[in-house]
Structure formats: C-alpha cells, structure tokens
Amino acid sequence: MKSVVLLNDTSFENHHGCNIVVENIKRNLEKRNIKLLATNPIGKDWKKNKSFLNFLNEADGVVINAEGTIHDDSEYAYSLLEIVNYTNKPCFLINMTYQNNSEKFSKLVSRFSKVYVRETFSKKELEKDNIESVVVPDMTFYKLKKDYLEREKKEVYITDSHDIKKSEQLYNIAKKNEIVFLPII
C-alpha cells in the first residue's frame, strides 16, 4: 500500500466547507488504496513539525491541499511549495487556485509531479509558465457529484461564495432563473 502525508489540512479551521474538503481528500485516498500517514494543519510551519517530518520520511509521497492558498506571492503559500526542495518524493498539488504569482512560485510549481486546479483561470495562468495542470472540480463537490449523478432527475443548484458581493450576485441569478440557491452552510 502506498502512503502519503497531507500538507495544509484545513479541517483545523473549523469551517464546514474546509471539513468537507479534507474529508473528501481522505475518502479519495482511501478509495485508491493510499494510506494517509499524517497531516500538517493550515498555518503550522511543517518544517518545525517534528511528527509530520517523521511521517514524511516514511511516506511515499506528499499531497498539498492548495485550496485558495496559492495566490499573490503569499509567504505561507511559498512555504507550502518549498516541500519540493525538501524531499525527492513525488509531490502533488490538488484543489488549487493559482493567480498573481511571480516566477519564484512557478519554478517550484513546475517541479510537482502533478498539479490539479479547480478552474480554467488557474490552468491558463500556469500555461503561461509552461506548467501542465488538470482541471477538476473543487474537492468540496467530490461526494456531491457522485450523489448527483446517481439521481434520476438532474437539477441545477447555485451556491454562495466567501465574497459577500459575489454571493449576492449568485443569489440574484438563482432567483431570476428560478434555480434553487443552496448556501454552503
């Protein structure tokens, strides 16, 4: 059985959406017969987490839950990406939004074994730096997609955003088009 460690475990944020994402990541790994040895919480410096580093040494690879972290040359984002300088093991960026980053970021991202983004804007940003990526839905919707596909009747729903103005716009679109509006919480 292959094993990995997870960097940027957002379930420690105590936010419903973050909990769903990490739960879905764990479910996905299990489905692929990959053992999750350890996680490093969001905001905690993985380089100083001795327990995490011990498990990293045992693991076959590293998964980074990038979520909305890799943008605007964020110091925290850069610290996550630096894992490719620390280990020679395969590293995977998943669930990523990527925007407004400098060349120092793209140099690190280009060294990842696989990069999975959650929208085409990020894919286009990476293509500018000749970095291949695959667009997949946000991990929030992993289980929802399966449930939706198993239904006989296909319905459309609109959800909200962390941005209040965008949430209002989404709500108005739903109302105007008689579409069910489902806030994430």
Give the location of each predicted region.
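Active-site anion-handling motifs in enzyme catalytic cores
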Residues: 1-185
